[in-house]
Design a protein with these regions (language model features):
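Short alpha-helical donor nucleotide-sugar binding micro-motif in glycosyltransferases
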Residues: 42-43, 50-55
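A charged, aromatic-enriched C-terminal amphipathic alpha-helix characteristic of glycosyltransferases
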Residues: 125-152
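Short glycine/serine-rich donor-binding loops of glycosyltransferases
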Residues: 68-71, 89
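Aromatic "clamp/platform" in nucleotide-sugar-dependent glycosyltransferases that forms part
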Residues: 63
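Conserved acidic donor-binding segment of nucleotide-sugar-dependent glycosyltransferases
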Residues: 95-96, 100-107, 115-121
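Short hydrophobic beta-strand element within catalytic cores of glycosyltransferases
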Residues: 80-83, 93
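Nucleotide-activated donor-binding/catalytic signature segment of Leloir-type glycosyltransferases, i.e.
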Residues: 26-46
Length: 160
């Protein structure tokens, strides 16, 4: 519904591609009926890489996913990211340089950030910076997060 509202306020050509499956897909498909929203289902490998390559920006609207590996994937694919200032995104996204962080839970601010995305040329420059930043990170941080979660679940103190 928010995307449809954004389209009304935007003069630029927009297209939303939703990758993945989940319990809300049927409901979202019904809401988007007749619009230009594309639902790809779950993708991996080359198919997923093609979707990233065709995008100008990546919007990560989750307020519950803590690891956010898709944020890393998008940035590694050269996309600036719009996300909430929460969990993994806040660690990787540099405000106005590699993407934008909206205050956690403030949906109106998040939507306004999307409406105000800059032109494609600026997005490409930001995506290049995002890719460069993420190349230096590697997978150490998400692996460490996962390790900490396992230790926490097992109620064992993690090694430093």
């Amino acid at each position: 519904q928010s995307y449809l509202n954004i389209k009304k306020e935007q003069s630029r050509k927009l297209k939303m591609v939703i990758v993945g499956d989940g319990p809300d897909r049927k409901r979202l498909t019904e809401i988007a009926n007749g619009s230009d929203v594309i639902f790809t289902g779950s993708l991996t490998g080359q198919s997923l890489a093609q979707v990233y390559a065709s995008a100008d920006a990546f919007v990560f609207a989750s307020q519950i996913e803590t690891f956010g590996n898709v944020v890393l994937e998008a940035m590694a694919s050269g996309l600036p990211v719009v996300a909430y200032n929460y969990a993994s995104p806040q660690r990787y996204i540099k405000q106005g340089i590699t993407g934008w962080l909206s205050p956690f839970g403030q949906v109106a601010h998040f939507m306004q950030t999307i409406i105000q995305l800059p032109e494609q040329k600026v997005l490409r420059c930001m995506g290049t910076q995002a890719r460069q930043d993420i190349e230096s990170v590697g997978w150490q941080y998400p692996v460490k997060q996962f390790e900490q979660a396992l230790y926490h679940a097992a109620n064992i103190k993690a090694a430093p």
